[in-house]
Amino acid sequence: MNLKTNELERYSRQIIIKDIGITGQRKIKNSKVLIVGLGGLGCPVAEYLSRTGVGTIGLIDHDKIDLSNIHRQSMFTTNDIGKYKVKVVTDRVKKINPNIKIKSFKKKLNQSNIKNLIKYFDIIVDGTDNFASKFLLNEFSRKLKKIFVCGAISKFDGHIFSFNFSKNTSPCLKSFYQTIPNDEVLNCEADGVVGTIASVVGSIQANEVIKNIVGIGKSLNGKVLIINLLNLDFRVRNLKKIR
């Protein structure tokens, strides 16, 4: 699918980057990315992928906005309290970039609906706040051979994972979390969270999506990036496939 004249202007500052160019921008336009969970992580992912020009973006969330969300969920304002997140993000993204297609689902992800929700998309991005959902996305992304980009945050800490399940040698989320953690682990509701870590982790997730689409850069696939903003500690750890 070719780029229109207004798209060439809109994306001109990234098209001039040698690693992207016209060819890379076409790949971005032709891609389909699903974002599950529109909170602290999903908001920056949705914003930056829409600004980057991802051609089709899927949005899944069943929750409403409350006052405690506002400090870290960058697409919402006080006036949005009580509204459904998926509706607000959909409207915002359409204003940011009217050239892209949005598929929005006001649903709670579960075992019975997940396959039909994710099968259409190339890349699945996890922005959920519980490990049951993360492991469900991990399981079905693996079964359907998708690229899966996952994030988790708590306090000043963040984890970013990327898995390319089209490769049978890829490890998975359970390679890091051997069992599903208790809800208290990396749970911003229980432990608290600063808004900045949500923005940083979400932005890196969006960047990993772009790298996977275009096929550029040093890949995080099969690895975890561990971040602590309090001590400015950034570490990459290789993951091994569980047999």
Question: What label would you give each PLM region?
Answer:
Residues 1-243:
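Adenine nucleotide-associated cytosolic modules
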